[in-house]
Amino acid sequence: KVSVGTQASKAFKKIKGAVVSVEAYSNSSSGSDTLEDLFGDSGSSETSTSEGSGVIYKKDGNTAFVVTNNHVISGANKVEVLLSSGKKVKASVVGHDSVSDLAVLKIDASNVKQVATFGNSDNINVGETALAGSPLGSEYATSLTQGIISAKKRTIDVTDSNGTSTGQATVIQTDAAINPGNSGGPLINLAGQVIGINSMKLSSTGSSTSSSSTSVEGMGFAIPSNEVVSIINQLVQNGKVVRPALGISLVDLDYVSEADRSQTLNLPSKVTSGVVVMKVNSSSPLKKTDISKYDVIVSLGGKKVSGLSSLRTALYGHKVGDTVEIQYYHKGELKKANVKLTLESNDKNTSTASNSGN
């Protein structure tokens, strides 16, 4: 009988050469008043601002493609990839997506000796062995951590680099050590297949300034490989992810006072969650309904809408052109409308938690 350790070692060898470190640089200014400033050198320089991992998943002619996290390369004006051989190469961004926190880079394929393969994340089971690596980026590159699949479909709230809510994500939970530097790297099974892309870890519960905050260990999260494949294919083909939109501006009902809920929205007291329509754009598909300012959306496509995060999750579960049923309160009355979803008018896919365009 082959031990788990032996299987893990074989799996590591299958993917070792495809795992890379990703380093992002941005311009910084020294702010000093020097002779160089007087002669045209402002003192700006490229500084490494972020480091994570990535995995080479495809070679096409002279080009190799790397998947990593969007937050690793976001805002960078230069990206470099450190191969398992120790060679550092320039990378360019093919496309990135803040909602899924995924990005695709391309590099010269001449130095690429190994490419990873994706497994089917729908087929994983709780308790199965999971492997991750590069816990602190390039300093500990090509190292390996081992754990299990703790949960297949864990729903968590997601924010971008500015702390803005971008919705909710269904992720794989694992106790394989996930640390700074793991971001963007692969979570693999014992067959050496990528079953997820490591994205984040939960280090504490509650507010960091709260006395009730509790330190947490062994809770890492990875984006399921089936979702990864869908997203990166779109990024390579279009440079972005195409998502549907409603063409409206919204605010969480949580931000509305009890008095305004009753007097302005005419909302029944039993309705305690939802999103308030603040504006319907001229090109919005909702123009064909009577949904208007101060209406409260409580359901989309059969899924409860408790706030902006859950609305985005429900909305992004559909495609452009889909017709969905929206349930909403209009002047205190619960109504329904069928709406055909249109193309999102911007590529940012992010907005403030208190006021959002969707």
Predicted regions and their residues:
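N-terminal activation segment of mature serine protease catalytic domains
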Residues: 1-35, 51-53, 125, 233, ...
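C-terminal recognition in membrane/secretory proteostasis and scaffolding
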Residues: 10, 190-191, 204, 230-358
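A conserved glycine-rich beta-strand in the N-terminal activation segment of trypsin-fold
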Residues: 2-10, 41-65, 87-90, 114-117, ...
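Conserved active-site neighborhood of the chymotrypsin/trypsin-like protease fold
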Residues: 58-142, 299, 303-309, 314, ...
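Terminal peptide-recognition signature
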Residues: 20-22, 38, 54, 64-68, ...
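Gly/Ser-enriched beta-turn/beta-hairpin loop segments
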Residues: 30-49, 95-101, 139, 153-172, ...
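Active-site loop architecture of trypsin-fold serine endopeptidases
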Residues: 31-32, 48, 76-79, 113, ...
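Gly/Ser-rich catalytic serine loop of serine hydrolases
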Residues: 50-53, 115-120, 171-188, 277-288, ...
